[in-house]
């Protein structure tokens, strides 16, 4: 596990280069938000020690308790790119552990129970630390099994997201129709007939119709 860059240090007298770096706000629950990436100037030697590599599993030090410790895999979207010290970068041994498998483990009920139990809670937020992240026990099936599980979860989650998107569009359409219908009725553009009222009554649940 690699710690990140501590902000506010002075590098006076040293040659510096501008690098983008990830903040806690960039690491979301299961994905990265790279719409607003900040940059800063540090010496190349300092940057080398906190530079992200594809396959690093990113975890935030603090946030909502139910999202604490959830891993997001860095795919090299920006190169080079550094990370702040409040963002942990876990680098897996490729012959033992797949990054995406680790990310799914941290998002599982097993992972959630661990980080919720070990997280330090404050009024609105919770926090973990490098020691607790390092102590997280990771089940290690053979790499072939890890790969199979990752492929299965990727497929199923992708399918569920597609269904969710379709339902979301349907809800948007129905919401727009509802607003249009209300507008037409209250402005007199649509006349309500006895048949319309009878149809509404027929669709009401029995308990409501009898109330």
Regions found by a protein language model. Name each.
Residues 1-11, 20, 25-57, 203-206:
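Sequence-specific dsDNA recognition surfaces
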Residues 7, 80-88, 120-147:
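A short glycine-rich beta-alpha junction/loop motif
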Residues 8, 46, 122, 159, ...:
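Short, solvent-exposed loop/turn positions at domain surfaces
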Residues 23-24, 48-107, 125-129:
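A short beta-sheet element
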Residues 24, 42, 92, 138-140:
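Hydrophobic residues in beta-strands and at strand termini
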Residues 27-28, 65, 112:
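Active-site/binding-pocket entry motifs
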Residues 40-41, 46-47, 77, 123, ...:
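A structural connector/turn signal
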Residues 113, 139-211:
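Amphipathic alpha-helical coiled-coil/heptad-repeat segments
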